Amino acid sequence: MGKQEVQHSTSRRQFLKSLAATGICAAAPARELFAQKGVYKPTAKGGCIDVHHHHQPPGFTLGGRGRAGQWTPQQSIEQMDKFGITVAILSLTQLGDRVYDNTEKGRAAVRTVNEFGAKCMHDYPKRFGLFASIPFPDVDGSLKEIAYAYDTLKCDGVGIYTNDNQGHWPGDPKLEPIWQELGRRKAIVYMHPWVPSCCNNLNYGASSFMNEIDFETTRAVTSLITNGVLFRYPDIKLITAHSGGTLPVLAGRMKDRYPAEKAQYIPNGLWAEIKKLYYDCAHATYKMPWAALTALVPPSQYLFGTDYSPEPIESTVNEIPGLGMSRDVLEMLERKNAERLFPRLRFKV
């Protein structure tokens, strides 16, 4: 073992020891499924892998949004057991304003979030994974946190929001060094929508979470494609939330209106780029969004997600039996595709 490896190993042991001392975290036919009265029986052997599952460190509040009470790992495990979910990959909930403020305060908040998530993963290694947060508009801070998250915390991937609330979307050229590093690491990037401050008043009395949240996913993916990020870093695996939001519905219009001067970024056409992305099904298993997604994207790209705890798990699983998926497709959605992305989650069952 080289000197650098020894340092990384020692750093990780010291980190876990210090956290322990703090005590932060003590396809079947549809008719064969049961998803009533708060119960879901997975088709996949070993149960579901939930890639859209939010944690909330102590002191980080939703300001009235989401389900009541402080999140705990035990709370999630209780719900996971109830719905046949064996593993959940944790990511930060709607708290971008705490971690994207582009200051040392934001860097410190990100570190707190990631160490909390890593402690949960360490305490329950067969129940939790981690998408580490980064202070996205802060390029230097993000690069340092990526190194810490991968080399010390051993995260499964990186979680970002669809914008930084300062007028920048993920494809912004100023963020190129971050994508370069994520590409070098062949990172799995989980992208969650977050409504920017510019767009909170577009709904005339209705919450922006009613519809704007799904437009944000489309906006962010568009920025990544038209600015060549996904073209330059093909080894990055990008996961989008909520069955892609409005992306599958607008894919035809996007193809017809794609800027000709940026055709070099889509050598096989726009739809080919959209089909490469991964899509979790959280709170988007109604027949309408699912029909749009499955008309364009192959089953190899579907992932199971719940958006717990801001959303009840029932809002996702109760609709799955009515989609008429085959056993093979259900198994891919519930577990097999995630096992392919995250080989360490292939636990014996």
Which ranges hold each PLM region?
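Hydrophobic faces of well-ordered beta-strands that scaffold small-molecule active sites
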Residues: I49-H53, A88-L90, L130-A132, V158-I160, ...
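Acidic-and-aromatic substrate-binding clefts and catalytic sites of carbohydrate-active enzymes
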Residues: G66-Q70, R98, F136-S142, N165-D172, ...
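Active-site gating/metal-coordination segments in enzymes
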Residues: T86, L92-V221, N227
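Aromatic-anchored helix/helix-loop segment that forms the rim or "lid"
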Residues: K262-A291
